[in-house]
Regions:
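Intrinsic-disorder/low-complexity peptide segments enriched for small residues
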Residues: 5-6, 25, 33
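Bacterial N-terminal signal peptides
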Residues: 14-24
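Compositionally biased alpha-helical segments
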Residues: 28-149
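Bacterial N-terminal signal peptides that target proteins for export
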Residues: 2-16
Length: 149
């Protein structure tokens, strides 16, 4: 009788552990949201964005969280640069921080320290795009819709 009780306890414990394992695996996608819409910026910039895996995407309605300017720290100051003034942005890590080397259309380059959790959005020819700043390698801003640069 005592042996049967131990056997049943072992089966119950094993079953509970297996169920917990399945639940934990099944919850792996929790927190990941589907992208069904993007913030619509005031101006429609087109851009080519290359991520850290060298995947290139041509996008329209390009924005940084709905805004058409790049904001970051320069020394102790916050700086915002309108997309219309920017030719190209190269992102790189220095330690745990993310920096952007901004090539301007008419001014010298400017380096900004970025908040890596901020998100770029855009419209692809086949869908929508969102990507955190920390996963972007390079962005080239081409034009405002209807205008060639």
């Amino acid at each position: 009788m005592l042996g049967t009780r131990r056997l049943l306890d072992g089966i119950v414990k094993t079953t509970v552990m297996v169920m917990i394992g399945f639940c934990a695996v099944g919850m792996g996608g929790v927190g990941e949201e589907k992208l069904t819409k993007i913030p619509e910026p005031d101006d429609n910039f087109s851009a080519t964005l290359i991520d850290q895996r060298d995947v290139s995407s041509h996008i329209t309605l390009f924005s940084l969280e709905g805004q058409t300017f790049l904001s970051g720290k320069r020394g102790g100051a916050m700086v915002s640069i309108p997309f219309g003034n920017i030719k190209e942005i190269n992102f790189y890590a220095r330690g745990r921080d993310i920096f952007a080397m901004v090539t301007m259309k008419k001014e010298p380059q400017v380096e900004l320290e970025m908040e890596k959790d901020r998100v770029f959005y855009g419209q692809l020819s086949y869908g929508l795009l969102s990507i955190k700043v920390e996963y972007v390698k390079k962005t080239t801003i081409h034009s405002l819709a209807g205008q060639e640069r």
